[in-house]
Amino acid sequence: MTGPFDDDGPEEDAPVPAPPDHLAGLRGIDLVRRTLEEARGAARSQGKDVGRGRSGPARRVGGNRRRRTWSGPGPDARDPQLLGAVTQDLAKSRGWSARVAEGSVIGRWRAVVGDQIADHATPTALNEGVLTVTAESTASATQLRMVQSQLLAKIAAVVGDGVVTTLKIVGPAGPSWRKGRYHVSGRGPRDTYG
């Protein structure tokens, strides 16, 4: 008894398809090569990229052939570039320059304004050109307000004009006497500490 999956090999009675008339005189490998050439020609006529099989890549014939030359001791476009220069070019090309400048104001605060100011004031936010600076005491906040124009000039010299247009100097938050969940509003905070 034989089942549908029993296969003892090709049937002897199966007809072998005959090649087309224009290929009737070819046999064996010549028939295969000619058929492959026709298939590649049909693919080219449809605009498809035709593979080259196992042969190597096609060499350029004539035309604009340039031999590589040594770059010499001077700087060249192929020389390794500094990481800072490459990232700066990337930021410019992607339109990130303003965001990078804003981040450098906060990230390099101590280098921008100096140690004496950085010890008593911390930048907290930069939104639309307004830099919010929190001072550790009301006296420090008052001193920062007096030198505000010099601070803006220092910041503009380091990161460029227009990044920071105004300084908002905030003193320390006063203590809260609020206890519990419920609260009755009083007369507001007093400047008793600071």
UniProtKB/Swiss-Prot annotation:
Biased composition (Acidic residues): 1-14
Region (Disordered): 1-81
Bias type Basic and acidic residues, positions: 30-52
UniProt feature coiled coil, ranges: none
Matching InterPro entries: DciA-like, UPF0232_actinobac
Superkingdom in the source lineage: Bacteria
HAMAP family given in the database record: UPF0232
Similarity comment: Belongs to the UPF0232 family.
Record NCBIfam families: PRK03195.1
Protein name (database record): UPF0232 protein in recF-gyrB intergenic region
